[in-house]
């Protein structure tokens, strides 16, 4: 019979079975207290195994639910405070309730009685267990002879299973399962399975040992042959060739190469070992092996995916470009989430590196290359830049075959060797300027490089073996994305870099360009002061660009002249104001267009956009006696000429409505001119300005001078959307115009313009040319239509008089 409650003594790493007599060492307070309680009562102690042996003070949840009830036979206290007890186990016990008394644990439980199985089955299992046990002893499992014989002589099936489980090196969980199994047949079967697994493990170990022995024998044989070869090589070529081969061999053994690569490289190394070091082919193989051992096959940097740090770096190095920064941070956020899921085993590790190839699109000097460098710094990766401008040979990407003299790997492999890691940020600059020739299409070669489904096994012609590019973060840049072949462009995600506004250029000049140029020209900040007004005039009158490269050059020129003044005139401080610029840099190089001073007949203010920014332009129309010819000047492109013809057709169609005599078109020549004739002009966006100027010239109604317009037109009078809204509006603002006509469908594009720059400006969004003429002409559309009505009335009266 079991007591109502029993003190619990947790044990670590072992399981006790009924009928066993064994000593227990107890050093933990929770165990010593339990033993004291048992001795004070009926000397019955419940011994239970811990699930985790690292837990120092176990609670009920840390213990298994089946233990062994034991009688304490003897107890001895040690000088260090620990105790040793001799116990005899007498029953399996399943705990029904735990009692946590603070300084020790107690439990209420019930005896887990043996369930005898089918006699024939039990007898067979007993025989099998003893056979496997003996087989293990023969395989070298050491047990004291008297212990082994005692186990083999056991007749009780229950005790046989328990004693075998106790003396074998089974896992704690397996031993506990044997303790928890009440059915004797099932318990024997569980022990039999464990014995067979142990025998299988021993057989596997024996097979491994045999393989290792054979490998050692083969290595010894190879070593012997290699030493013979070395001796022959020394006789033929001296010590230098042998040392070189050994050096390559040591480096290759230190590399964790894929099997296919190792096989090919060892073949080349063996060929090299048999050659004279000074032969031409040996030189080719030597260069090849040098490339192989210096490539980062498994060297990588650990990604730093701290978004706050990345944001700080982007803000530190670049002003503006908010959309670009947001997209870069989104890209890093996705990589971080993927990396966390891969660590949890939810997605394969290869999925982490899969993602869009970023394509930075924009005019020169707007920060495409520098932001790629900032991304590398934010990620903690190496940075490599390869310029593809003018590349016309496929071998520049894939490498040259080794049959050619002076063959080298392609730029991709060269860049990876330069980086020293297999996961750098790799910038492919000017990808839109790739050429094509009889030597192949490098853009087609890039398809394999940039395709995540293929670049895991990119084969450079020079290497001749696959190299994994899947961990490389490729970023491309381009000025004109329309020049990129469609299959290549399809693999990229374009991110547009727009030209900087004047305000952005001013901030960039103050924060980055001026301090950098001061440092490069050996000046201290207190030696030269450039006023904000001077910088603004420098931007508007001495540069015309989308980025800030020319601006930095002009600042550099300004500071060099200031440095000369400091030395020649002995000045301690030079202050450069707006008025001083001409003395330092000469007369202004660019004079921005400004609004006309008063309304004029036949002159409308349009807007244009180039990669270096936007501005206004004047569309001039003159009507003169002639034969109905349309004259177009000002270097107009084909599309702009078509817009002019469409404007003329619209004017003819609405001639009576606007009071224009139809015969005027046949008896007059119409001359359309767009000033700055040396500059080519193209695009459909001047359509509304052409119509306004043309109708004004034909009706002699002036066009307002304080309003600028842009938009494509149709023959039916619809106004269609155009591009470059931000640059055009900023150009108009710079020219002093505060009222702008835009297509209705371009209304969302205003969000790209900074809010402070939209203030004090009026925007009219139109869908039809009637709305344009109502806004652009003095007096509006009503005055124009009234003129038409008067003209038609006068014509009818004239016809009636002539008829009478």
Swiss-Prot record:
PROSITE patterns in the record: LON_N (PS51787), LON_PROTEOLYTIC (PS51786)
Reaction(s) the record says it catalyses: Hydrolysis of proteins in presence of ATP
Species, as recorded: Thermus thermophilus (strain ATCC BAA-163 / DSM 7039 / HB27)
GO BP term, pick one: cellular response to heat
Oligomeric form and interacting partners: Homohexamer. Organized in a ring with a central cavity.
Protein location: Cytoplasm
Protein name: Lon protease 2
Lon N-terminal domain span: 6-199
